Amino acid sequence: MRQILLFAALAAVLALLLVSCGGTKDKPVPTEEDAPDKAAYQKISAEEAYEMMASQEVVVVDVRTREEYDGGHIENAVLVPNESIGSEMPKALPDKEATLLIYCRSGRRSKDAAQKLLALGYQNVYDFGGVIDWPYELVKEG
């Protein structure tokens, strides 16, 4: 009698498992086309950023402080300190369709700035990290 009860309990548990793991006939599996459009910045290397600067129209955005910028920055970079990026579009970046190449000193602020710029509606945001990893020439003001 005990074996029959144990067998019945095991069969009931197995039946519950099979029912709870039912197929997805009623629900189609989501695909990339079904996913909502989520804007995301792209992380690229300094070398990739350099190639983009040489081959297409881009806006290079330095998100460090004025003092850091004056100490040496990438040629033609626009200064938009990370701390100044808030709920309004930065005046130095009027075109939300422009390709933006973002950098800071080490990569932390550029990541933060890239996320904030996406939230403001910028479409083509690339983060290439910090100027400490920039193997090319920097220019100084003055």
Question: Over which residues does each language-model region extend?
Answer:
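Rhodanese-like catalytic fold shared by cysteine-dependent sulfurtransferases
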Residues: 2-10, 16-47, 52, 70-99, ...
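Short, glycine/acidic-enriched loop or turn micro-motifs at the edges of active sites
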Residues: 65
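Structural scaffold elements adjacent to functional motifs in cytosolic proteins
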Residues: 60-62
